[in-house]
Structure formats: structure tokens, C-alpha cells
């Protein structure tokens, strides 16, 4: 706990200092990438322009509207993002000992990005960062799959123009679904377009740090049935400041609510623990690497799920119970914009998060199913659809039961649920 408090103080102090320094700089020029893509792509990094991209004094009417539109549409400040520009080097965010690590995994890699109602500036900055900070020998392609964005937010034409300007037609696979698939099914459809040996699923508002990919590939070489996670750093939704986050495992409670599990200070006093991958009971879901062949072997995501929610729990359980593992690679760092809220809608008339969670519970919890419904009683009466396919995967892979998972992977899950206390 002391480690978390001390690091948080340093991070906060650094942000305050950076903000104070930025306030002394003039307001950045605003170039709108939707209207002038070439001009926006020509913008130099902030370090060269010497301006403040977050300053809200003396905004023009167009700038004010852009800021308000961004917060309403994306739950982050699109004006700050556009003024930040197309390129940013967030530097080396991992522990200094990571610089000494040697990696020899050489899988061709496809980065798979699903976007629905996404801001153009964030996705283009992410693509530029992936291209710049990934070895050419490893990056096979980036799959950009647009899941039926609403009319004002369709990016496919902008992305095609970007690919032509940058000469990336052979590196970017740009596809659009005219009908809303939802994040889960869209990920499956997009992954089927990928031709790399490894797929990296990445949310559409991320930025990679230097040497982000190599640490993700090495554990896969050591165990091909690995799902490998980076450390997810924080990008502020208003200022877009990049801040390193605590190294942590991922977990969940009996209601499948995700949570971070922070490692004790003493763990990191052993130098090698700052660099070596470690097991995690679960995953956040937005950022992960695995062999495409293994993803298919696991039955991909459950195509009976709707929109978003619990797919991370399902994939975690499938990996652990069916002969694989989930690990965190602390030397891999990827920043993620943590938005103010989830700005897109679910399926009308349906609690999709609960629906998906019930499907996972019915498929994987077995004798522990009652613990889930004690936390989520509304789910007990919910119609959850056909489970034939996920059950066939479970049988085909001869998966272990939930008791094994608790005893061998996640003993912290065993305490009684609230209504039994």
C-alpha cells in the first residue's frame, strides 16, 4: 500500500508541475483533421511546437464547439486530442531494468482495432505510434474494423485517405460493418481478417510506449498457449497527459465485476520481479496478445454475447481451465484513454452486460453458479440464449472445473458472497 501511495504522490506532483509549465506556453493552433487531414498530419510534436494544447482561454467558437462535441460524443476532449497532434513519443515507461532484457520471439503480428464512434485524432495518433515504435520485422499489419459508426463519426474514408497519404495501403486493413455487431462479435470478425501469427487486440484510443511489443511476444514463445497482457497506463481524458500506472494483476468478484489486484511492495524489491512476467487470474479485455491459432482453438469469443461485457472473464476462464494461462508482461506498456463514461449505447431493451455475464456463469461456474446469482439475482430469470457452441468448446478441450481454478489460480475468489456473510 505504501508503494502505491508514494508512487501516486510522485505521479500527481509530476502532472501538477507539467500543467504549471504548460500554462506558461501559448495556445496551440487548431487544425481540424476532419477538414484538413494533410495539414493536421504535418503538425510537429508538441515538444517542437512549444504550445499548450489544453488551454481553454480565448477559444474560438469553432474550438468551443469541438471541445463540447468531443466530450458529448467520445467522453473525452477531442479539441485537446486534435491539438496534441498526430505524433507523440511517450518514451520508456517500463522499469529501467527492462532495457537490459533480451527478446528473441519473432512472430509476425497483426494489431486488431475495433472502433465505433471514435475520434479521428486518437486513432490516427495510435496508428502512427504503432508504426513508429514496432519493429518492421514484427508488424504484419493493423486491422481497422469500423463497427457501424453513426453518420457523424464514420472514419473509414478518412482512414483510407490517411493510408494513401502515408503510403500504408499494404499495412492497414480497413473494413467497415454496415450493421452493428457489437465489440465482441466485431473482434471475432476482425481477427479473421488478420494474417499474422499473433494477434494483439487493442482499444481504439491507446498509445504505445517504446519497445511495447517484444515483451508481449516472448512469453508466447515460451508457452504458445499464453495470453499476454501489457501494463495499462493512464491517459487523461481532458488533458491527454500520459501517466504510468501501478503494475497489477486482474481479477473479478462473483458478480464478474472487474478489479485490479495490486502486488505488495516487497515483491518488487527483488530486481527480477520488475521484469519477469507473472500470472494473472483475469484480464481487462481491451489489450492482449495471443497466437491467432490459439484464439481459434479456444473458440474465439462467444458469438452469442451482445455488444460488450464479460468477454474478458470468459476468455480468461477458457484459457486457465482449458490448458493455457494469462500473464502480465511488466516490460510492455500501453497507454489507454480512460473516458469519463461509456459514450455508446447497448442493445435497446436489454441489459447486455448482465446477459453476457449470465452466459459465462451458466457455461463455466458449475457448482459455484449460485454465488453469481446471489450477487446478480436479476440474472436468474434472464433468458440467456443458446449455449451449444461454448459448451462444445468446453467439452472439446476437456476443460477443468471452477474448483480447480479457485484452488490453483485464484484462491482469493473463495470468500463468501455478501448475502452469506
Swiss-Prot record:
It is found in: Golgi apparatus membrane. It is an enzyme of class 2 (transferase). Disulfide bonds join 98-331, 322-399. Mn(2+) binds at residues 203, 205, 336. Glycans are attached at residues 52, 58. The keyword RNA-binding does not apply. Substrate binds at residues 147, 180, 204, 308, 339, 344. Residues 1-3 are cytoplasmic. One of its GO terms (molecular function) is Notch binding. A motif (Prevents secretion from ER) lies at residues 418-421. The chain crosses the membrane at residues 4-24. Residues 106-219 are annotated as: Catalytic subdomain A. InterPro entries: GalNAc-T, Glyco_trans_2-like, Nucleotide-diphossugar_trans. GO terms for biological process: protein O-linked glycosylation; regulation of Notch signaling pathway. Residues 277-339 are annotated as: Catalytic subdomain B. The keyword Oxidoreductase does not apply. Pfam families: Glycos_transf_2. It comes from the Eukaryota. One of its GO terms (cellular component) is Golgi apparatus. It is a single-pass type II membrane protein. Pathway: Protein modification; protein glycosylation. Signal peptide: none annotated. Belongs to the glycosyltransferase 2 family. GalNAc-T subfamily. Potential glycopeptide transferase involved in O-linked oligosaccharide biosynthesis. In contrast to other members of the family, it does not act as a peptide transferase that transfers GalNAc onto serine or threonine residue on peptides that have been tested. Some peptide transferase activity is however not excluded, considering that its appropriate peptide substrate may remain unidentified. There are two conserved domains in the glycosyltransferase region: the N-terminal domain (domain A, also called GT1 motif), which is probably involved in manganese coordination and substrate binding and the C-terminal domain (domain B, also called Gal/GalNAc-T motif), which is probably involved in catalytic reaction and UDP-Gal binding. This is Probable N-acetylgalactosaminyltransferase 8. The lineage of its organism: Eukaryota, Metazoa, Ecdysozoa, Nematoda, Chromadorea.
